[in-house]
């Protein structure tokens, strides 16, 4: 079918400004380059204006720290002008009088994960005019071939009824155009809620969202840019998009058992999101993975500012030893050992020897059999 002029115009206007590679990651690196033959996964990031979508995306994918998101809009405009991108483009961001970043229309970015997997991220501006256009003139373009819908709710929104209305409109469009899409709801800015009220408020909001989402299923997360909850949510989202995650987990378990590790974690290299893990016994802190992601990512950023690159580290005390090291071209690995009889050198050699196996497994079209055997 031949496209109409209006459809062609919409497609042209929806081409957003180039996304800068993360600090410390050269342009064209594995974390950001567009591959020739990639498995693309379309991810919609939606929510009302000022809900925090662009800030969280910049923290996860562009190595911003929370306090720097207040000047995010001005930074993006500076980058647009420095790249000499046509100022008539409909995609840009501004910061309002209270520091909220507002995205206009749809900003596209491509983020490469684990070899051939590419996240085609659509950050959709949340102004009322644009939201209405998404459900009318741009409906098919926006909601076709979606793998994941992420809808962000400001927990302190004064227009909750309107938020829910737009969310339900998104679900109707998803049901029509991408019925197999996975739905995630992020109840954001939870740091603004009194600590003793957070569990109750989130539980009530989660129940409402699950009810409104039927017949679709939604997964809900409480999030804040000021703690590890943001990493918890996005790690869970990315986990759903990895095509061979079961093979990855099976090999990770075999690796952990062979080297007698208490825990093994895989982090995506650019974002430091947890993409897979294995543990042989329960741990007290259920949020330790996301805390580590947050800490190490900020440490990597500090290294970059000093013109140094983070490669590996070892932490040891009387109870355990933890190793974080480059694993494959797209991942870091963390290995936790509690057996004092196993020397550090042996663990590091085991990590090095396992790299080639996990490099093969990362390929989307790679082998399906278990690569690590006793």
UniProtKB/Swiss-Prot annotation:
The activation of GTP-binding proteins is generally mediated by a guanine exchange factor (GEF), while inactivation through hydrolysis of bound GTP is catalyzed by a GTPase activating protein (GAP). The Ragulator complex functions as a GEF and promotes the active GTP-bound form. The GATOR1 complex functions as a GAP and stimulates RRAGB GTPase activity to turn it into its inactive GDP-bound form, preventing mTORC1 recruitment and activation. GTP binds at residues 49-50, 52-55, 69, 75, 126, 188, 225. Its EC number is 3.6.5.-. It comes from the Eukaryota. Gene3D superfamilies: 3.30.450.190, P-loop containing nucleotide triphosphate hydrolases (3.40.50.300). One of its GO terms (biological process) is cellular response to amino acid starvation. GO terms for cellular component: cytoplasm; Gtr1-Gtr2 GTPase complex; lysosomal membrane; lysosome; nucleus. Pfam families: Gtr1_RagA (PF04670). GDP binds at residues 50-55, 69, 75, 188, 191, 209, 225. GO terms for molecular function: GTP binding; GTPase activity; GTPase binding; guanyl ribonucleotide binding. 2 transcripts of 2.5 kb and 3.8 kb are expressed at low levels in brain, testis, adrenal gland and thymus. InterPro entries: Gtr1_RagA (IPR006762), P-loop_NTPase (IPR027417), RagA/B (IPR039397). The keyword Lipid biosynthesis does not apply. Residues 1-30 are annotated as: Disordered. There is a cross-link at residues 203, 281, 291, 305 (Glycyl lysine isopeptide (Lys-Gly) (interchain with G-Cter in ubiquitin)). Belongs to the GTR/RAG GTP-binding protein family. This is Ras-related GTP-binding protein B.
């Amino acid at each position: 079918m031949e496209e109409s002029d209006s459809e062609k115009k919409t497609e042209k206007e929806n081409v957003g400004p180039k996304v800068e590679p993360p600090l410390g990651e050269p342009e064209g690196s594995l974390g950001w380059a567009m591959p020739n033959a990639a498995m693309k996964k379309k991810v919609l990031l939606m929510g009302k204006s000022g809900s925090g979508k662009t800030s969280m995306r910049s923290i996860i994918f562009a190595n911003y720290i929370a306090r720097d998101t207040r000047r995010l809009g001005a930074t993006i405009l500076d980058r647009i002008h420095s790249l000499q991108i046509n100022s008539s483009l409909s995609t840009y961001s501004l910061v309002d009088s209270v520091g909220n970043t507002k995205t206009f229309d749809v900003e596209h970015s491509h983020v490469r994960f684990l070899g051939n997997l590419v996240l085609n991220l659509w950050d959709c501006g949340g102004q009322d005019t644009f939201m209405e256009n998404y459900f009318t003139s741009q409906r098919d373009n926006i909601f076709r071939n979606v793998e994941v819908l992420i809808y962000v709710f400001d927990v302190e929104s004064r227009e909750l009824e309107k938020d829910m209305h737009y969310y339900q409109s998104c679900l109707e469009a998803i049901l029509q155009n991408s019925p197999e899409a996975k739905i995630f709801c992020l109840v954001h800015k939870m740091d603004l809620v009194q600590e003793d009220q957070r569990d109750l408020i989130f539980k009530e909001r989660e129940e409402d969202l699950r009810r409104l989402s039927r017949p679709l299923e939604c997964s809900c997360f409480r999030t804040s840019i000021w703690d590890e909850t943001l990493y918890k949510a996005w790690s869970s989202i990315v986990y759903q998009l990895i095509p061979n995650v079961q093979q990855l987990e099976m090999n990770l378990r075999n690796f952990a058992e062979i080297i007698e590790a208490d825990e093994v974690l895989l982090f995506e290299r650019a974002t430091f999101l947890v993409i897979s893990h294995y543990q042989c016994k329960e741990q007290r802190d259920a949020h330790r993975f996301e805390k580590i992601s947050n800490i190490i990512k900020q440490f990597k950023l500090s290294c970059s500012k000093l013109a140094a690159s983070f490669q590996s580290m070892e932490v040891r005390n009387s109870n355990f030893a933890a190793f974080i090291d480059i694993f494959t071209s797209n991942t870091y690995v963390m290995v936790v050992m509690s057996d004092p009889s196993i020397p550090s050198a042996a663990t590091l050699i085991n990590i090095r020897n396992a790299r080639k196996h996990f490099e093969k497994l990362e390929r989307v079209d790679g082998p399906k059999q278990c690569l690590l055997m006793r």
